[in-house]
Structures are given as C-alpha cells and as structure tokens.
Regions:
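Cysteine-dependent hydrolase recognition
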Residues: 1-428
Length: 428
C-alpha cells in the first residue's frame, strides 16, 4: 500500500546455470486496511538480459471463503488436523490434490456457516480447493468446428509435406507434391498441421505430434514401404507459443512448430533439431544426439505464398536440369576457429564421410584456422575466408555445411558472412 517492503537482487546466471530463484520472507502490518495491494517492480541494468518465469506470493490468513472457489495449502503439519472454513455454504466441497497429482474429496460437515473437515489423509503442503457446487462457473466456449478427418487411414506414403494451418502455402505444396509424383514416382501426402494436432495431440499445437504422425505411418507400413521423406513446408519460430514481444504480432497459423531441446534456457546447450521428427523406432527418442532418423527431413522456411512459389520454382528448375553444371557435384565444408579446433574437426569428419560415401562428389574445405586472421580495433576478421566463401557460393554447391558459432544474422564471431551477402548472390 505504498510502503517499500524489500529490495531483492537477482545474481547473474553462470555459464552452467539455466535460472536463478530468489526467495524473500517479510512481515508487515496491514491493520486498518480493507485491502492490501502488493506491487512488484522489475528493472535491469543496461546490457542485462532476463525474463521472469513466475512470481509466487505466499501468506497466512484465516480460512474465510471468498468467491465461488478458493485454493489454499495446508503448510507443514506433524499430525492429522481438522480445519474450519468460515463464511461457508452447505453446497461447498473440498478437493485435495496431492503432490503426485491425485485428487480426492475431503469429508466435511457443515453447520451454521462453518465447514469443518476431518481427514487423516491431508498431508503437509497438500493443495486444497473449496468449490461451491451450485455456483455459476465459466463454461467452455466453442472456438471452431472440427471437420471429419482420418489421417490414420492413409495408405502407403513415401513423402509427407506438412503445411501451416492458414493454408497460404498449400497450393505451392501441392505443386511440389505433383512434381515428385510425376518425376520421382513418389506417393506424396500434403497435410495441414492442425489436422495432425487433431489426431495426435488432442488439438493442441505440439511439435511431437509431427513425430507421432510419422511413427503411425512408419509402424503400419509394409517392410520396405516405410515413409522416406518429411518436408516441413513453412517457417518456424524459436518461440513456438509466440508470447515474446519479438513474435507476439505474428500469426501462429502461418508457421510450423520447431522441436527444441529440453535445456532451452541455455544459450550453449539448447538447439532446434528437425531430426527429432524422424526418430521412429520404439527405442528411439531418448538420446537425441546419438539416435539416427529413419527418413530424410527438410524444411522450406517460407511464410508467404510468394516466398513459397520462389522456392518451388527453383526446385522445378533444378529438377528440369535448367541449371545443370559441375556445382551439383560440389560439397562445401566450413569450419569455425577456436574451441580447441572442435569445429574444424567436426567439419572434417563429415567431409571424410561424404567423400567415402560417393566418389562422384568433390569436397571443398574452408577452415578458418587455415587462413590468416587480421586483428584491428574493430575486431578480428578473416578477409581471405570471406572472399573465398563468397566466390564458392556464387559458383554454386550442392551442399554447404557450417560447423561453428553464429546467429540468424551472421556466420561466426568474425562476421564472415551476413544476411546482406546472401541477398546479393545471384543465380546464373
């Protein structure tokens, strides 16, 4: 109520931490106040980055029924106790929710506005919820009708193309599907994401629904006729729920979901991987870094129909040999510097496996540590790496694979490649 109760400092998060929890216990006198208003103000110094997950406010008070339902906890208890709920009505029941999620009704007795409970089953820190059975509670609202569908009835399917719910990309996805049907003889199914959610995650958008859908097709297929390809025809967002300021203005129906590692709060140990959707054997999915996908997975990161059309146009041209050339036999491997050469070694391991798999492919290697680094007041740079990389990209390559640091805007700390460079490349 206008009085400062406490100042709490949240320490910085270390490299191996994901979050910090701050607790505070304060006593204050609210005598004479009909209502106590607790206000939380959060500020951070310039350059600091942090997001509050939740604030928990716990206090002791008399058990007086408020509104149509009221949740409270038992606190620490050594013995079985009875509790009295004042301002009660005869239609109130009390539910107990244990730590493991079990819900039971607590026996009680009503007498003249007081509800008394008697139960030896109430434990320390149980959550109790008093509910007026005859009260008017909000009712579920109809959001939309779900049309009849049956993805489980799909037969032999070589390729699945998933498209966003909005349907903006469906026409171009069908165009690409027709190309693969005619040119490659594949059985292709174009499926909207919301249809997958309806059958594999109870209508809730969930990236794992994509995997469950593919596993259904995988398990029911005859030997040798399992799905071979999954194409995610639509862009993704690191904020799947689009709750952050960066994504709040976007329409989630224009995007497909991403699978993110459990440790998604870490800038080092978190990652987005599409391979997850292809781990289809019964024993797979627990060790994501070692399990191997059972089909090829790709994504066309289109948001608008114009972007989708440009991508499909390029695939059609590629299929028709319009841009035939020796670049189709060229592989470009890129390896960042630092970190005890781990990025260069990773890139080289992949390069050697590619060379051993297909002798018709020529592997070009650009490893940062093989070039001279220039040190200036504005930072470190690799001018020769940048020059050779841009030349290789302009010439063309079947595959460009980079191992190292970067972001959505630049490649490596030395800013070897940026978005503007990619926009300047012209097909010839």
């Amino acid at each position: 109520n206008g009085n400062l109760l406490d100042n709490k400092y949240i320490p910085r998060i270390g490299d191996n931490d994901a979050a910090k929890t701050v607790e505070s216990v304060k006593s204050f006198d609210a005598v004479g106040a009909d209502k106590s208003v607790i206000k939380l103000e959060y500020s951070a110094p310039a350059g600091a980055e942090g997001r509050i997950d939740y604030v928990s406010f716990t206090y002791n008070r008399k058990l007086v029924m408020q509104n149509n339902f009221m949740a409270f906890r038992t606190g620490a208890m050594k013995y079985a106790v009875s509790m009295q709920l004042e301002n009660a009505t005869s239609d109130i029941i009390i539910w107990r929710r244990s730590a493991d999620g079990e819900c039971t009704i607590i026996p009680s007795e009503y007498n003249d506005g007081v509800l008394t409970t008697y139960s030896s089953n109430i434990k320390s820190n149980d959550e109790l919820i008093a509910v007026k059975r005859n009260a008017n509670f909000p009712e579920p609202q109809v959001v939309d009708n779900v049309s009849n569908q049956n993805l489980h009835s799909l037969g032999h399917t070589d390729m699945v193309i998933l498209v966003p719910q909005s349907g903006k990309l469906t026409a171009q996805a069908e165009r690409l599907a027709e190309l693969h049907r005619d040119a490659d003889g594949l059985n292709v199914a174009v499926v909207r994401a919301d249809m997958v959610y309806n059958e594999f995650s109870s209508g809730t958008p969930d990236a794992t629904a994509y995997r469950r859908f593919m596993k259904m097709l995988y398990d029911k297929a005859e030997p040798g006729k399992e799905p071979r390809y999954l194409l995610l025809f639509g862009d993704g967002a690191w904020d799947n729920r689009m709750k952050t300021s960066e994504w709040r203005g976007e329409n989630p129906h224009d995007y497909l979901l991403c699978y993110e590692s459990d440790n998604s709060e870490s800038k080092v140990s978190s990652y987005v991987m599409e391979d997850y959707f292809g781990l289809l054997d019964d024993t797979e999915g627990y060790n994501l870094l070692k399990d191997r996908p059972d089909l090829g997975i790709g994504r066309l990161p289109a948001i608008t129909e114009a972007q989708a059309k440009a991508m499909v146009d390029k695939i059609v041209a590629y299929s028709g040999r319009k841009y035939a050339g020796d670049w189709k036999n060229s592989i470009l491997m890129l390896g960042d510097d630092g970190d005890n050469n781990i990025h260069m070694r990773d890139a080289d391991n992949v390069a050697e496996k590619i060379a051993a798999t297909d002798s018709s492919l020529y592997v070009n290697k650009i490893y940062w540590d093989s070039y001279k680094m220039e040190v200036t007041a504005s930072g470190n740079s690799y001018p020769t790496v940048r020059k050779e990389l841009l030349e290789q990209l302009q010439t063309g390559a079947l595959l460009v694979n980079y191992s190292g640091h970067g972001s959505a805007d630049v490649l490596s700390h030395e800013l070897v490649l940026n978005k503007g460079d990619m926009s300047a490349l012209v097909s010839s």
